[in-house]
Amino acid sequence: MDDPEGTNGVGAGCTGWFEVEAVIERRTGDNISDDEDETADDSGTDLIEFIDDSVQSTTQAEAEAARALFNVQEGVDDINAVCALKRKFAACSESAVEDCVDRAANVCVSWKYKNKECTHRKRKIIELEDSGYGNTEVETEQMAHQVESQNGDADLNDSESSGVGASSDVSSETDVDSCNTVPLQNISNILHNSNTKATLLYKFKEAYGVSFMELVRPFKSDKTSCTDWCITGYGISPSVAESLKVLIKQHSIYTHLQCLTCDRGIILLLLIRFKCSKNRLTVAKLMSNLLSIPETCMIIEPPKLRSQACALYWFRTAMSNISDVQGTTPEWIDRLTVLQHSFNDDIFDLSEMIQWAYDNDITDDSDIAYKYAQLADVNSNAAAFLRSNAQAKIVKDCGVMCRHYKRAEKRGMTMGQWIQSRCEKTNDGGNWRPIVQFLRYQNIEFTAFLVAFKQFLQGVPKKSCMLLCGPANTGKSYFGMSLIHFLKGCIISYVNSKSHFWLQPLSDAKLGMIDDVTAISWTYIDDYMRNALDGNDISIDVKHRALVQLKCPPLIITSNTNAGKDSRWPYLHSRLTVFEFNNPFPFDANGNPVYKINDENWKSFFSRTWCKLGLIEEEDKENDGGNISTFKCSAGQNPRHIRS
């Protein structure tokens, strides 16, 4: 097969080399025929416009036209950008406002347009309703003026940009609307987040017809514990609300559950009494797990316990078909709704309060007020005390009367009766041996101690003052303080000797003690208190009263100085019964005292040595029960009716 013309092989393709062979029909010097005379008609017309001179001018014109078009396009883009920027900060359109109203808590703003053909258009706000976010009337008016001024600027900008062309406004309308929507959404979110609780309270009142804050008493601290809580939750699914009735049983004693529906879903109202006290943080965490909603969608506060209107609300709704009630009704609801409880709550009996303080041996005013107030849930008289406007006066009167009764009762008792009453108020289980072992450890003969202790308790003249002396850390104060604590005696200190009333506690005590007496104290005792050490009658200055004459109770004195042998105070030698403690007080490896002396051990000691101390009396020999009658400060009641 012949090769193709003009190629040098098929395999080379278009990229290969090829040879072109020219066909020569005429050579130089050949004669030219007449038919081919080139000069015959060579007028040059065929060479006209052979070279196109208009190419340069056309290219320049096209470049200038492209540049002008580019400038025009850039101008249009710049105008559109400026217009969009101006309209972005101008007031939103009426449709955008309506969309924002639906999202941002029903803020209704309507606009009225007048004189649209005029150059300067004005917009007036014809309606401004409450937004629900707590704005005052002044703030709403300021917002209205701001929107109006922004609309005026927007109209002016629109009129200025209209000269460029209406096509730019139409092309950027979608972008501008999207730009206007973004800031309105941000504002709506900010208002919603900053007023979450207000929105939830509004939705609750809209659904239930009653304010949630009227049913509760707000707690400022989240750490305050309480057994009764009132809880409202939002956005709960129906299945979760139904399952809550079963899940909450294991945590509560009483539950009152209500569920209503609104545009935010199911709104739950729960009154619950837990098995133990819980704070708000614990309750929020528990309910968030049970309801599957965040803690921000709940409001948790304790209910009002003294509001009769609130109690009636819970009482009436408990009988309706929208409530699910489980457990025993709390006592505060019964107290405020049952007629008999209301009658009883209005009566306060001071004698009942005094009897309670006397029976529980509470004489301090602060303890009386605090402990009696804790009984308000179970004692109607205590509840009436809390409702009284004269609680301070009642507490003061109760404390004064209780102290009067206790003082008179103590004065009417002998030393044996007083020790017996103290033993009755002390628990059993003590051992008297540590006391005896400690005395022997200090080289004190137990029999000699019993003889001296018997005279000491009986108040024998010149034998009613016991001195425990010796070096430091030998257990003198430990031994004396334990005895004073058991017999509920008084302690006087020389530091108050400048006061006229520093001996006043001795007027109400069966036993007294002066601890760590120094040389200056011994001098004062030697000068002014010899009669007191003798056990004779003395005169004591008592505050707000005339001088009181009484027999000084037995005194225990601890000192590092043995005044019974010191020559500086010779007149005290015969008035002091001295016991020396010379050995250091022993402790075990754990730092606990080897000889434990407490109230139980003293009770065992007195029970063991009762007869040897001469505390038995004639009434005890008859074995006819206690010789102290029970005190009653309230009048008895006759349960039977008096017949006419």
UniProtKB/Swiss-Prot annotation:
Keywords: ATP-binding, DNA replication, DNA-binding, Early protein, Helicase, Host nucleus, Hydrolase, Isomerase, Isopeptide bond, Nucleotide-binding, Phosphoprotein, Ubl conjugation. PROSITE patterns: SF3_HELICASE_1. The keyword Kinase does not apply. GO terms for cellular component: host cell nucleus. One of its GO terms (molecular function) is ATP hydrolysis activity. The keyword DNA-binding applies. Transmembrane segments: none annotated. Its EC number is 5.6.2.4. One of its GO terms (biological process) is DNA replication. Phosphorylated. InterPro entries: Helicase_SF3_DNA-vir, P-loop_NTPase, PPV_DNA_helicase_E1_C, PPV_DNA_helicase_E1_N, PPV_E1_DBD, PPV_E1_DBD_sf, Rep_E1_papillomaV, Znf_lg_T-Ag_D1_dom_sf. Gene3D superfamilies: 3.40.1310.10, P-loop containing nucleotide triphosphate hydrolases, Zinc finger, large T-antigen D1 domain. There is a cross-link at K551 (Glycyl lysine isopeptide (Lys-Gly) (interchain with G-Cter in SUMO)). Residues 146-177 are annotated as: Disordered. Its main location: host cell. It comes from the Viruses. ATP binds at G470, P471, A472, N473, T474, G475, K476, S477. Residues 179-345 are annotated as: DNA-binding region. HAMAP family: PPV_E1 (MF_04000). Belongs to the papillomaviridae E1 protein family. ATP-dependent DNA 3'-5' helicase required for initiation of viral DNA replication. It forms a complex with the viral E2 protein. The E1-E2 complex binds to the replication origin which contains binding sites for both proteins. During the initial step, a dimer of E1 interacts with a dimer of protein E2 leading to a complex that binds the viral origin of replication with high specificity. Then, a second dimer of E1 displaces the E2 dimer in an ATP-dependent manner to form the E1 tetramer. Can form hexamers. Interacts with E2 protein; this interaction increases E1 DNA binding specificity. Interacts with host DNA polymerase subunit POLA2. Interacts with host single stranded DNA-binding protein RPA1. Interacts with host TOP1; this interaction stimulates the enzymatic activity of TOP1. This is Replication protein E1. It comes from Human papillomavirus 58. The lineage of its organism: Viruses, Monodnaviria, Shotokuvirae, Cossaviricota, Papovaviricetes.
